[in-house]
């Protein structure tokens, strides 16, 4: 999604003469992480195309969005090494993390040391620097939080029940079961809640979800709606009172769903995974809870149910933070300035 924003950005494309090559080998989400002869053949073709286009264009700067670890990193290692062999100036932009989890492996450490040498790096948020600190001097790092297009806030009718929204793929590691357990705690306390899960079924299936909800007697207050997009998705955001995202997903860096929730003036409750603490201001725009902690989730949700004025104030503060830092225009201008700085630094 962020790559498309950059590709389509008038601000960036008017500032530079841009040429784009798609380096993705996966056809869809289910294809990510899988190998095969087809991908090897396509990768070989990609390398030839990169070499050809680089010779033809002679760019001032090559911008690459690599993967942090595993087979996908090994592929991107070859791409960056090819560009280095061609004496190109390179900036890499990370939308994922996990380097620090592999840096003590001899082979990976060797590759990372070679990969990051003489590179400029763009990170999504300040605290993600710890992931690359072993290999990259901070002077070579640029911070560029993501941004999203703005939408109109539509008025909604008051609801009797307090509406909780979870918006993401139905993956266990996104904290689905933790939120379900928190809802069970709140129901036992007699809190009038409605919790809506919106997202594509994944390692949590629809049948499994319904089975758990029925066993915990939550079918009157917990609902799953499957994947929703565009206006249908926006309708859930506009009707919610708070947004809850208790993720412990390894690759979580800078969830755009939090920005979408903040734009709609929703207080956000999430974890300290990845760059999330740089998005949510603790106690001001929402709360950060410990991972795997349904009890903490329930306590924070209950607090916002019992303090509607504070809930509204947090939502307002989140909206203001979104407008100040996380609009697409802010992101595009940050990227433009960073790319200009990178080009200038390589000329020194």
Give residue spans per PLM region.
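Nucleotide-activated donor-binding/catalytic signature segment of Leloir-type glycosyltransferases, i.e.
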Residues: 208-228
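Conserved donor-binding/catalytic core segment of Leloir-type glycosyltransferases
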Residues: 156-174, 179-185, 195-201
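Conserved acidic donor-binding segment of nucleotide-sugar-dependent glycosyltransferases
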Residues: 282-283, 287-294, 303-309
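Short hydrophobic beta-strand element within catalytic cores of glycosyltransferases
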Residues: 263, 267-270
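Glycosyltransferase donor-sugar binding loop
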Residues: 20-26, 167, 194-208, 226-227
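Donor nucleotide-sugar binding/catalytic pocket of nucleotide-sugar-dependent glycosyltransferases
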Residues: 112-153
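A short, well-ordered alpha-helix in the C-terminal region of glycosyltransferases
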Residues: 296, 303, 310-325, 331-334
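Acidic donor-binding loop of glycosyltransferase active sites
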Residues: 238-252, 266
